[in-house]
Amino acid sequence: MQLILTTGGTGVALRDVTPEAVREIAIRELPGFGEIMRIESMKITKNAILSRNLAAIVDKALVICLPGKPSGAVECLSFVAGAIPHCIEVLQEVPTSC
């Protein structure tokens, strides 16, 4: 498995524990993904500042934690989609030009 997407559990409610669960098994966090998802989402809703979206490496897989609202998940994924192929290539040790 090279890419794992989660939806939901990234808000501020006490039941929202997805980021903590992923951090427990991650070997590295990729803060840029969460930063971009929040920055771009802020253009749509000011409540995006409450989001705890993140991306991390688990084994050799990229895990991206998206919001639970379907439209928010699609939007957030679109904000980071351009970086996903390169990240997966690096994790899978595919030779690249950079």
Regions found by a protein language model. Give the residues of each.
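Non-catalytic beta/alpha edge segments that cap or flank active sites
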Residues: 1-98
